[in-house]
Design a protein with these regions (language model features):
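Polybasic/polar functional segments that serve as interface/processing modules
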Residues: 1-82
């Protein structure tokens, strides 16, 4: 049996830099998307870069979702694979 794999990456622009540098809010966002998609979170990891920027990810039983931010540019990329 072969599983169908789906992957999507979304670029989000003109985002408030404070949000893009808030690890708790970004993890909450990932969890909300996971729940809305009826997926199942297993583990989370977050890395805060200096002086700014965050990479955060949730390992899902179906695969993963991640966000990478550049607050200085107001940009984030959200990637999900299931």
């Amino acid at each position: 049996m072969h599983a169908a794999v789906q992957s999507i990456t979304i670029k989000v622009s003109e985002v408030d830099s404070a949000l893009l540098n808030d690890a708790d809010e970004l993890q909450k966002l990932l969890r909300n998307v996971t729940e809305l998609a009826d997926l199942h979170s297993l583990e989370s990891v977050t890395h805060q870069f200096s002086p700014q920027g965050i990479s955060a990810a949730l390992l899902l039983s179906e695969s993963h979702i991640a966000i990478h931010t550049w607050p200085e540019s107001g940009v984030a990329y959200i990637a999900m694979t299931t």
